[in-house]
């Protein structure tokens, strides 16, 4: 996971020395908005936007889910990067269709030649203005949720105003402890930092499991944005985070209520097709040579996600 410094690519891993061994994630560098209003800089139009994703990445997975749920597959096209993220960062197996680039860092410098920062996915590109709209997944899914409704006719709302406070509270709790918590655990470089993140992670999972013992979903009786933001971490947990990131107190399959909830979400039409366990396992185990220097990718585990979820 390298970075750009004033437009020049550098193959450098995360520096945890100044943070006492703790992994600290950088903020997204592009945070503009598509808005359904006349005269706006970024208006919702069919075919105007292009999404760059990794099938391995939980943050990018969010955007693929919302693209599917909100009937945007015919309106926003996609480039999928290779699962291997080596010295050149995220790369394409074939030149991507807009500029013929083969590296994600070239997309960033296409938008801003002197860009400095990490080169991450997802990236939402605007073909009309030739720039990146956003590389912040939480904001891309909000745009997909609400700003294309007139175009698609799909008014399903995963961030309804009456539940917004609850959704935000869950998001604010789950992001540091679970979504980013698995990375804080796996990328920690001191025992103290690892154990701090590990304990917070499993405390949060215990809280979620207890909540799901009494509630159908996180914010109530309907699936919301908070559930999908949690899902993309849960679905990777037993496949990679338990072993690769040393998050091994319990598997998700050991949590009675979370496991049923995970299976229910996975079995919703179209969601399985956004989930690729080959890419997930290959990326983490093969790319993170500082954690897994042999680059051996495990054959297992066997995941039971398609049997009845038992949640009514």
Question: Can you say where each PLM-predicted feature lies in the sequence?
Answer:
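C-terminal alpha-helical interaction module
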Residues: 1-312
């Amino acid at each position: 996971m390298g970075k750009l410094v004033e437009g020049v690519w550098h193959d450098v891993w995360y520096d945890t020395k100044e943070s006492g061994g703790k992994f600290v994630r950088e903020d997204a560098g592009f945070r503009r908005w598509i808005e359904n209003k006349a005269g706006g800089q970024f208006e919702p139009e069919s075919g105007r936007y292009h999404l760059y994703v990794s099938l391995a990445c939980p943050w990018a997975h969010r955007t693929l889910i919302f693209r599917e749920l909100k009937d945007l597959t015919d309106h926003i096209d996609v480039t999928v990067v290779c699962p291997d993220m080596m010295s050149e960062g995220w790369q394409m197996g074939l030149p991507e269709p807009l500029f013929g680039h083969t590296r994600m860092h070239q997309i960033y410098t296409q938008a801003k030649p002197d860009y400095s920062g990490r080169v991450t996915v997802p990236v939402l590109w605007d073909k009309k203005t030739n720039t990146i709209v956003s590389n912040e997944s939480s904001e891309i899914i909000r745009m997909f949720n609400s700003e294309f409704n007139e175009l698609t006719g799909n008014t399903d709302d995963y961030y309804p105003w009456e539940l917004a406070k609850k959704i935000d509270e869950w998001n604010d709790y789950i992001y540091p402890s679970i979504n980013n918590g698995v990375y804080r655990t796996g990328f920690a470089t001191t025992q103290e930092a690892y154990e701090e993140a590990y304990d917070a992670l499993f405390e949060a999972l215990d809280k979620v499991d207890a909540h799901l013992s009494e509630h159908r979903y996180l914010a109530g009786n309907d699936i919301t944005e908070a559930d999908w933001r949690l899902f993309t971490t849960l679905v990777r947990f037993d496949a990679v985070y338990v072993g690769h990131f040393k998050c091994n107190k319990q598997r998700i399959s050991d949590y009675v209520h979370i496991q049923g909830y995970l299976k229910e979400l996975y079995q919703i039409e179209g969601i399985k097709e956004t989930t690729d366990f080959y890419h997930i396992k290959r990326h983490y185990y093969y790319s993170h040579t500082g954690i897994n220097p042999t680059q051996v990718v495990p054959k297992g585990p066997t995941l039971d996600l398609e049997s009845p979820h038992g949640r009514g």
